[in-house]
Swiss-Prot record:
This protein consists of an immunoglobulin-like seven-stranded antiparallel beta-barrel domain linked to a subdomain composed of two beta-hairpin ribbons. Disulfide bonds join 37-47, 88-95. Belongs to the neocarzinostatin family. Keywords: Antibiotic, Antimicrobial, Disulfide bond, DNA-binding. Gene3D superfamilies: Neocarzinostatin-like. Binds non-covalently to an enediyne chromophore which is the cytotoxic and mutagenic component of the antibiotic. The chromophore cleaves duplex DNA site-specifically in a single-stranded manner. The apoprotein cleaves proteins selectively, in particular highly basic histones, with H1 proteins being cleaved the more readily. GO terms for biological process: defense response to bacterium. Pfam families: Neocarzinostat (PF00960). The lineage of its organism: Bacteria, Bacillati, Actinomycetota, Actinomycetes, Actinomycetales. This is Apokedarcidin.
Amino acid sequence: ASAAVSVSPATGLADGATVTVSASGFATSTSATALQCAILADGRGACNVAEFHDFSLSGGEGTTSVVVRRSFTGYVMPDGPEVGAVDCDTAPGGCEIVVGGNTGEYGNAAISFG
């Protein structure tokens, strides 16, 4: 099974809200990192590296919490340049929570603000 990510709540979010991120189907990963990213016009993710959460996976599953921001300073992942302020309301692809496993597996789930 491929990696899956769910976020609760995922819509109508307030700036600074805490969401619960659940990951499953991470077949080979034992730990993961969750963070918020905005999707740029070219399809790259510009992520909020200031607020990321490492968590452990057991049987390919795990849960963590992430604080979400309507706007933040985005960095192209995994080690790319700072792209400046990004806003989830105006980002071409909106925003999502991305979970990356320690073996390169990843999944994502869209979020939106109220």
